[in-house]
Amino acid sequence: MTSSINILLLLHPTVVTDAQLVEQIKSKIYQSHNNNNNNNGGTTTTTTGTVNINLNQQIIDRVTKGIIELPYDYYDEIIYINPNNESQYREIPISLMQLIYKLLKSNGKFKGDLPLDQNLDVLMTGFIIEEEEKEKEKEENNLEGELVNVWVKPIPVDEPVVTLLKKKTTTSNTTTIKKSLPLFKKLNKDEINNSDKDINNDNITNNNNNNNNKRKLVETKLTYFSSDDENSSDGSVLENDDIDDDDELIDENDLLNFNNNNNTNGGSLLSDKLITPRKCDISLNGGKKRKKACKDCTCGLKELEELEVSNQQNLQDQILGKLAQSATLEAIKIEERLKQQQQQQQQKVKVKFTEEDLSEIDFTVQGKTGGCGSCALGDAFRCDGCPYLGLPPFKPGEVVKLDGFGEDI
């Protein structure tokens, strides 16, 4: 029984220049699939049959640029050879990862000199990272190999198929019972009229009860206020016959007058009957003021809070106004200082040279000498700022002229 293994060997451009290295890599690949049996080039013989190894060699740059087109879902293994040891030179672009994922079969492996700092990109592409022992030349001595990462393309999981149950069809022998809608009995006209009469009677009784309750409430109010008013201001008792229906109404002015007259006796009608709002006492709250006044405050706390807020705002406005005034004054002072400095600079005495100072100097003429009197002798006798530096010594009778000497001064 024969089977085939398709292997793609991706080589770095630097590896292609060494033909012996490429042949060694190929021989190692054939040996790894030998399984300790006979090997003839690309064919491996096992106990169960022969295995044909189809090895395809490509340069990774050509595959990345799309110069060479490879079949999808074809290769069992893809081996990448990169001689660079530094991780920054082993980076694989994401587009190449996706292409390798498409070239591999399910459960196919991508191994070799892989980068170690791109695990997130590998997982996002769809690979599974596994560890595998690296093959060494010392495997003949039964030494354990170094663990390296291998990218495996997972086997796709088949989605479970859910079968829908069919509706049961009734046979001809079975009889189906259909549920009918509920039936309601229709009322006669006599019953409707009787029900309307009952409803009207109930409404009449309810109205009578409400009127009786209102009358009782009025009577209690009248008895409450008339109990104190039966004694007149003269001390005479009013009889029940003298009290009419109009006299039962109480005037507010009479109550106020009555209250003022009875203040001297230690009691008043308004103080006993009326309920005045209680002021907020700070001592009852442990000496602490309430955080905020009530929504419907009537004790005056809300007005006090508004007054405090307005006082604080006025104080802040005063402070800000003073700061603004001081800032403007400082700015005015700074501007005045700058103006004074500019005026002082303008008033400084400017150095002006006369025509004799700006005229050309001839040291060969008697009486025309420099400040040191030795400029005509040469550079050895000239000062650092002498305009004749670099010129040879002057000869008697030689005319020396300097162009633009006045501009330098």
Curated annotation (Swiss-Prot):
GO terms for cellular component: cytoplasm; mitochondrial intermembrane space. GO terms for biological process: iron-sulfur cluster assembly. Residues 195-215 are annotated as: Disordered. Its cofactor is [2Fe-2S] cluster; [4Fe-4S] cluster. Residues 201-212 have a biased composition (Low complexity). It is found in: Cytoplasm; Mitochondrion intermembrane space. Coiled coil: none annotated. A motif (Cx2C motif 2) lies at residues 383-386. [2Fe-2S] cluster binds at C280, C294, C297, C299. [4Fe-4S] cluster binds at C372, C375, C383, C386. A motif (Cx2C motif 1) lies at residues 372-375. Residues 1-153 are annotated as: N-terminal SAM-like domain. Its main location: cytoplasm. The C-terminal domain binds 2 Fe-S clusters but is otherwise mostly in an intrinsically disordered conformation. Component of the cytosolic iron-sulfur (Fe-S) protein assembly (CIA) machinery required for the maturation of extramitochondrial Fe-S proteins. Part of an electron transfer chain functioning in an early step of cytosolic Fe-S biogenesis, facilitating the de novo assembly of a [4Fe-4S] cluster on the scaffold complex CFD1-NBP35. Electrons are transferred to DRE2 from NADPH via the FAD- and FMN-containing protein TAH18. This is Fe-S cluster assembly protein DRE2. It comes from Candida albicans (strain SC5314 / ATCC MYA-2876). The gene is DRE2.
